């Protein structure tokens, strides 16, 4: 039988290796918030000639109009995305008019979104509240669902630990993506994050439920061996549900979808994979460490982590 729990500290190290680089990038460059959360304007335009001006030329145009923080990116559909501080419809009309005359082309506005700074902060606060409520609901639900198990709240706390792991991986991913590819944390990202949280909890309930069932059957079996046996039993189900269905669909969207959906699909792709990963390699090992009291050895000088 696979001895997954015997290598738990190796998997903890792998998780840290995935999370820490992104957190370092975030500490240096900050979280790439979109206008949804910090306020500002997003203008997407298309040129009739299909010939796009250089981003520097568009930035210069904005500067001439007194907008000094414009950021320009091109998309795979021959359009320009311009992010800037908040501008109203009148200023947007002047920008488009200036583009028409300066670049001698016909410009079509495909999208224009503006969010004031106050509204952006309010949305950010509500998003944080939504994630916090989701985390609290997870603890309450799992504690209630496993109420017949000794120390049922530990199952809920370990699920939250693993869920935080998944969230940190996703945040690390978008932080690095923000620097390399111009990704931003927007409303679509929040949708992906909440989806990851929901799937993550569901997968952990499956693993924990098998541990609960086996604890009634193998009453005299060591808890670590029982948990490892339960993980092996659910491993095929998790892989089949994850890799053979959802991940293939998301991979197709990431490879062939539009630029807006691509970031969403990649975040979901990684996040859902992490949901399965953390159920096996983070949540269950954390429960074993807590149940066995192994964590007390961490604070003893010269003590080595226990291994199976």
Curated annotation (Swiss-Prot):
Main subcellular location: membrane
One Pfam match: SecD_SecF_C
Lineage: Bacteria, Bacillati, Chloroflexota, Anaerolineae, Anaerolineales
Gene Ontology BP term (one): protein transport by the Sec complex
Compartments in which it is found: Cell membrane
Its biological purpose: Part of the Sec protein translocase complex. Interacts with the SecYEG preprotein conducting channel. SecDF uses the proton motive force (PMF) to complete protein translocation after the ATP-dependent function of SecA.
Alphabetical UniProt keywords: Cell membrane, Membrane, Protein transport, Translocation, Transmembrane, Transmembrane helix, Transport
Family matches, as InterPro entries: SecD/SecF_arch_bac, SecD/SecF_bac, SecD/SecF_CS, SecD_SecF_C, SecF_bac
Record-annotated membrane-spanning stretches: 10-30, 129-149, 160-180, 181-201, 241-261, 264-284
Keyword Transmembrane set for record: yes
Protein name: Protein translocase subunit SecF
Family listed: Belongs to the SecD/SecF family. SecF subfamily.
NCBIfam families xrefs: transloc_SecF (TIGR00966)
Subunit structure: Forms a complex with SecD. Part of the essential Sec protein translocation apparatus which comprises SecA, SecYEG and auxiliary proteins SecDF. Other proteins may also be involved.
Signal sequence extent: none
Gene Ontology terms: cellular component: plasma membrane
Keyword match Transmembrane: yes
Species annotation: Anaerolinea thermophila (strain DSM 14523 / JCM 11388 / NBRC 100420 / UNI-1)
HAMAP family xrefs: SecF_B
Any one Gene Ontology molecular-function term assigned to this protein's record: protein-transporting ATPase activity
Membrane topology reported for the UniProt record: Multi-pass membrane protein
Record-annotated disulphide pairs: none
